[in-house]
């Protein structure tokens, strides 16, 4: 049997204990120690409070409007099933009218056949959707792999893009190798757009000249990721900016920039 | 007492008696926090919605066993985090191989950048911002992504002992900053 934990050692393990990062054996040892040690229990409570604050400090987002009604429907349905199933199955019910029983059986068969047809169609449709989703995930992973390769490269330079409005949370990071035309753009907290709108990246040369860096959209959380192949190496550009444009992009920016950054020195 | 002024404990007691109005009130009070944490951890709107529903349904079903020993909100968020970690770990087991770990790490890191944008969370934001970046990253990966210390060590190519020390120091510092531990 293992020796009981000392308080010092227990306190060392408390953070891991709360983060569920301990092996089961160590969890048991800490739990046992906590059951008898007031001092370590107090320590645990203080760490717990910190983690609780961390959990409450995430950016707040409204849940979908239908979630509340969905939840209530599921809860009530669950309760009715639990409460009413025994009542709805009388112990001594017998069929009293045979022709009706036969009719019901036939109707059930028809419903079953229709159901099988619908189910087959549904499964095929689901399979197509899963395949489409899988392809999207693969594309996304390839993009992330490229971003990670760029992050790990010693010559990569990160450029932080910010809004001109201090209160705007929109921001982004452009990962580029100055001597090359390839880069990866990651944006966060950009407002999601209607279907007929898109974001467009502009790569500014001298004066009002600029190259099109590509168009992209963001997800519901305002997160977007785009691979860029610029017409020239990034040393040629002096600034970058992102604007909102009609779907497909514009020959030049038509709205004020959402976020941007200077590139001098790259 | 009307619903708006009911305590969480009394709502839980009413839920144990299968009162849907109590669930509705409890949901209205805490849905935003639960959904936001789920979304931060899972990163997908649909999954976060499903997880939030699961959490509230679990509360509804097990309300009778609830022991009021602190803030119900904190308890609810711990429940949310545990369920999200279960999902994330299931995902990782499914995708477990060397090449996917760095991608998950990369995916995980943007979340902290957007953390704590509301004014009332200023203290947490300040305390987090004051942490050394390597401590903050390790803590986020452990807390919000449910990565084990060994997984974090592999991803960051850093010795396991260093990762453990970083997380411990990060939590100790946060505790000092947020709770004004004596001697600090």
Describe the predicted segments one by one:
Chain B
Residues 50-57, 70-82:
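Structural recognition of an alpha-helix C-terminal capping motif at a helix-to-coil junction
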């Amino acid at each position: 049997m293992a020796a009981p934990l000392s308080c010092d050692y227990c306190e060392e393990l408390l953070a891991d204990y709360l983060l569920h990062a301990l092996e089961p054996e160590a969890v048991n040892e800490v739990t046992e120690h906590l059951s008898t040690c007031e001092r370590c229990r107090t320590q645990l409570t203080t760490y717990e409070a910190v983690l609780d604050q961390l959990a409450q400090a995430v950016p707040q987002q409204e849940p979908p409007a239908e979630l509340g009604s969905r939840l209530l429907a599921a809860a009530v349905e669950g309760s009715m099933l639990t409460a009413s199933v025994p009542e709805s199955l009388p112990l001594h019910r017998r069929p009293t009218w045979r022709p009706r029983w036969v009719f019901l059986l036939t109707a059930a068969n028809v419903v079953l056949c229709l159901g099988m047809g619908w189910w087959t169609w549904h499964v095929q449709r689901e399979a197509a959707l899963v395949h489409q989703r899988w392809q999207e995930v693969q594309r996304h992973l390839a993009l992330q792999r490229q971003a990670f390769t760029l992050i790990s490269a010693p010559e990569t330079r990160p450029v932080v893009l910010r809004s001109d409005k201090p209160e705007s949370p929109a921001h982004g990071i452009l990962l580029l190798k100055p001597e090359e035309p390839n880069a990866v753009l990651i944006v966060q907290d950009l407002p999601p757009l209607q279907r007929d709108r898109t974001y467009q990246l502009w790569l500014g040369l001298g004066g009002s000249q600029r190259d099109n860096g590509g168009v992209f959209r963001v997800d519901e959380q305002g997160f977007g990721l785009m691979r860029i192949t610029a017409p020239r190496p990034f040393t040629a550009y002096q600034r970058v900016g992102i604007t909102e444009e009609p779907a497909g992009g514009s020959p030049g920016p038509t709205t004020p920039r959402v976020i941007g950054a200077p590139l001098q020195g790259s | 007492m009307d619903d708006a002024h009911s305590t969480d404990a009394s709502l839980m007691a009413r839920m144990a008696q299968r009162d849907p109005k109590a669930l509705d009130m409890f949901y209205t009070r805490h849905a935003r926090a639960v959904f936001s944490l789920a979304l931060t951890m899972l990163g997908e709107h649909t999954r976060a919605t499903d997880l939030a529903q699961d959490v509230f349904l679990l509360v509804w079903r097990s309300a009778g066993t609830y022991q009021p020993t602190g803030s119900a909100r904190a308890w609810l968020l711990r429940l949310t985090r545990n369920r999200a970690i279960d999902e994330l770990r299931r995902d990782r087991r499914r995708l477990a191989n060397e090449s996917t770990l760095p991608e998950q790490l990369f995916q995980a890191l943007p979340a902290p950048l957007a953390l704590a944008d509301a004014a009332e969370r200023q203290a947490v934001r300040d305390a987090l911002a004051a942490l050394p970046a390597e401590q903050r990253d390790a803590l986020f990966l452990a807390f919000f992504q449910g990565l084990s210390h060994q997984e974090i060590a592999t991803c960051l190519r850093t010795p396991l002992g260093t990762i453990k020390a970083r997380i411990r120091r990060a939590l100790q510092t946060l505790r000092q900053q947020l709770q004004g531990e004596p001697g600090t």
